[in-house]
Each structure stands twice: as structure tokens, then as C-alpha cells.
Amino acid sequence: MFKLKYLQIAITIYVVLILALILFQRFILLHPKKLAKDYHFDFPKSEEFYVQITSDIKINALRFSTTDSVSKGAVLYFHGNADNLARWGEHATQFTERGYDVVMYDYRGFGKSNGRFDEKNFLNDAQYIFDDLSRRYNPDKIILYGRSLGCGAAIKVASENPVKKLILETPYYSLPEVVWSHLPIFPFKYVSEFKVPAHQWLPKVHCDIHVFHGTDDEVVPYNQSIKLLTTTNRNPDKTLTTLQGGHHRDLEKFKEYQAKMDELLK
């Protein structure tokens, strides 16, 4: 009887935890920070603008100009799952100093962008932003750069459009796979609101692909990149820079990262 009672308690706790995981998955995966509409971005050689997605949805974006006299093209940067452009804009210099203009934007519900984040809008907005950028640059001059969460959007856009190159920093096989790697006793992959199946899109990418990942990434495990890259062998070139001891947020500090970026953006 006692064993049965404890089993019932354990099952009840497990079910409650699963329900909590389902109900609060948005707060687990997304950590946006809003910005006041009059917030001023203070980045050099940058311009703030909005992209009107629908009559009531406006996406806030930043355009950075290269420090070189002539631009090599543009980098469309898809940022991670937290904060806003006030943080992510700091990463633009690694591209502008190497001769590229940069466009980055906040997802719905992040920064000054209005609306509610969901998977469909996340992917559709990425294509819309790419289309907007394509009016200013030929697609063969556009590099897509995905960072963590943003890797899914970058891969999806690259799978449907001709671009110069796809660069991924700490990518994932799918979002449920990432959560599963941390909580393997929970069936999150079957109940997740967010799927973002990057592994289904990567085989359709025909441009060069390069991946950066640290071996000590505590958010998106290193093996996510290994597993993702095994899904494709169709593209002209796919390479992986493994950063020994690299975590989720510190890859830019590695000389191997900087050397590879010099090569990729030459």
C-alpha cells in the first residue's frame, strides 16, 4: 500500500511538472526585453528603421554601414532568444570592420517590435525582412548569420533563397531536441509549442555553410551541431569550427573564431 501511495504521488508530481513545462514553455525559451518607443540606439554608423509586416505589425531594425569605403555586401543577422537590439547591435562591428553592411532586427515582442512571438511569425517575418533587404542588395551579396535561436530562421531563409553564405553560431537540430537534452525525462518534443525543425531545412540549403560551436556550451549542447550537419551533404561546402572550452556566449573571444571569420568574410 505504501509503495502504491508513493507511486501515485510520484506520478502526480510528474504530471504536474509536465503541465507546468507546457504552460510555461514560452517563458523558458524566450527572454525578450521591451524598449520604449523613444529609446535611442547609440551605435556608430547605424540607422534605425521599421519594416511594416502587416497593417498593425511593425518590426524594429537597425542598419549598420561598413567602415570600408566600398561595401562587399550585407549580413542579415538573426539574433538569439533574449534581450533586444540594444544588446545585439554590439555584434555588428565584427562585420562592418570586415567590409560588410549589417541589418539586424528584433522579433515580435522584443525591443520596439510589437506583436506576439510564435513560430509561424518568426519564420515568415525572417523571409519578409530578407525580401526587404534583397531590394537593396543582390542575394548573391547577402550572408545570413544565425545566432542560437536565430539559426532556425537563418536556415529556413537559406533553404528557400539563393544567398552567398550561411553562418551559424551555436545552432540546433530542433528546439524540442535542445530542451530534451536538458530534461530527458519529459516528453517535451511531443508537446512543444515551438518546433523550428532546422534539420528538415538544412538539406535544402545550397550555399556554403559554416558552423561555430563551443564544446562546453551549457545552453545548446555541442552535439546539436554535429547532429544537424549530418543531415546534409548537398551543399558545396560545409565546415565546423569547434572551439574547445567555448560556452554559449563567448565564442567571439576565441582567436580561432576571429581567424575563421576573417576567412569567411574576406
Where is each model-derived feature located?
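Membrane-embedded segments
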Residues: 54-132, 152
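Primarily recognizes the serine-hydrolase "nucleophile elbow" in alpha/beta-hydrolase
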Residues: 132-135, 139-183
